[in-house]
Regions:
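Compositionally biased, low-complexity repeat tracts
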Residues: 7-9, 177, 192
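Intrinsically disordered, low-complexity segments enriched in small/polar residues
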Residues: 9-11, 170-171, 194
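Glycine-rich flavin
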Residues: 47-57, 61-159, 174
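A short core secondary-structure module
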Residues: 149-190
Length: 197
């Protein structure tokens, strides 16, 4: 399922970002809900939609997005402390939520054209990022043609986009490159059958 529309705005339509302390308090406040949904998350093998809805409504996916681009402008210390707090409710949910928040940090460090594409509708994206370079990307006009199979795409069920590590071969030498694609351009195989994650 896709994340719900972003509702983390005041009545005037201006987002009110959280400070570091407010973000940690929000994460601590998520603990009872995460405890109550831990069994459901285990059975579903993904975050319950109610959890995604709460994170989206809070604006927390904006955590690492720079404030001048519509985010909270917080740093890695904040996401670490928030993740630690949420883990008291459900470690696997805290892991997944933090992964989905973290990948906006990569976008924030990318070129403006990337930010414009991914943040066109809202100033964050929900995106997994498998790290192993198990696919290839061939340069084509306007981008790359990617092919491969990537595993462990944490949170892909709720994603808009995916970011994958690929091998780009130029002049016979493979180079590791991160490439992005809309979720609509990939096939998701439901192969995640594990416990405790």
């Amino acid at each position: 399922m896709k994340p719900p529309p972003d509702t983390a705005h005041s009545g005037a339509g201006i987002h009110q970002p959280m400070t570091h302390d407010e973000a940690v308090i929000w994460a601590e406040g998520m603990v009872p809900a995460l405890v109550s949904r831990a069994s459901e998350a285990e059975q579903l093998r993904e975050l319950p939609q109610a959890t995604i809805d709460e994170v989206t409504a809070s604006g927390a996916f904006r955590l690492l997005v720079p404030s001048d681009l519509g985010g909270w402008g917080l740093g890695l210390r904040s996401i670490t402390e928030m993740t630690r707090a949420m883990a008291h409710g459900c470690m696997s949910s805290a892991w997944t939520i933090s992964f989905l928040m973290l990948h906006n940090w990569f976008v924030a460090r990318g070129p403006k054209v990337l930010q414009d594409d991914l943040w066109a509708e809202r100033p964050y994206v929900v995106m997994p990022c498998p790290l192993a370079p198990t696919g290839t990307a061939t340069p084509v006009s306007g981008g790359y043609n990617m092919t491969g199979r990537w595993q462990w795409a944490t949170g892909v069920q709720h994603a808009d986009w995916v970011m994958v590590n690929t091998l780009v071969v130029r002049d016979g030498d493979p180079e590791s490159r991160y490439c992005l694609a809309p979720l609509s351009d990939v096939t998701v195989d439901d192969v995640w059958h594990t416990s405790g994650m």
